[in-house]
From Swiss-Prot:
Residues 1-22, 110-155 are annotated as: Disordered. It holds the Pfam family DUF2039. Keywords: Acetylation, Phosphoprotein. It comes from the Eukaryota. The modification Phosphoserine is found at S136, S144, S146. This is Uncharacterized protein C9orf85 homolog. The keyword Lipid biosynthesis does not apply. The modification N-acetylserine is found at S2. Residues 136-155 have a biased composition (Acidic residues).
Length: 155
């Protein structure tokens, strides 16, 4: 077989096929792994987002221990792993915080999506609480009605 790379098509299927997908939290159920899995990759382009998700999926993602230096403002403000720019600089220049290219940002840095979710949750909780209060009022009414009936039968 020749040693040429890239210009050759495979004539046979892969010899060994995995039966189960890799789970990065199967044996490592640490707090750090949970944080990494829950992290939202915002302020990056589609390609960089896919790269970061791949790193998380296959346990290759390493969080920063201390902030890195931003390439634009030269301050130690980069708190996300594999990023080269801090959030304010990336927002201001409208570029990807990881590769620095002027690509379309998939999930922007803004905090607006978090606010509506919280208000929706608070609203639904309010509805639940109101429903509980109404239920408890009905229970009290039912108890007072039953007391009234008991009072009628005794008198």
């Amino acid at each position: 077989m020749s040693s040429q790379k890239g210009n050759v098509t495979r004539s046979r299927p892969q010899k060994h096929q995995n039966t189960f997908t890799f789970k990065n939290d199967k044996f490592d159920k640490s707090v750090q792994t949970k944080k990494i899995n829950a992290k939202l990759h915002d302020g990056v382009c589609q390609r960089c987002k896919e790269v970061l998700e791949w790193r998380v999926k296959y346990s290759k993602y390493k969080p920063l221990s201390k902030p890195k230096k931003c390439v634009k403002c030269l301050q130690k403000t980069v708190k996300d792993s594999y990023h080269i720019m801090c959030r304010p600089c990336a927002c201001e220049l409208e570029v990807c915080a990881k590769c620095g290219k002027k690509e379309e940002i998939v999930i922007p840095f803004n905090k607006e999506p978090d606010a509506p979710e919280n208000t929706e949750n608070e609203g639904s909780g309010h509805r639940r609480r109101c429903g509980r209060k109404e239920d408890s009022d009905e229970d009290l009414d039912a108890e007072s009605d039953s007391d009234g009936e008991d009072g009628d039968t005794q008198a």
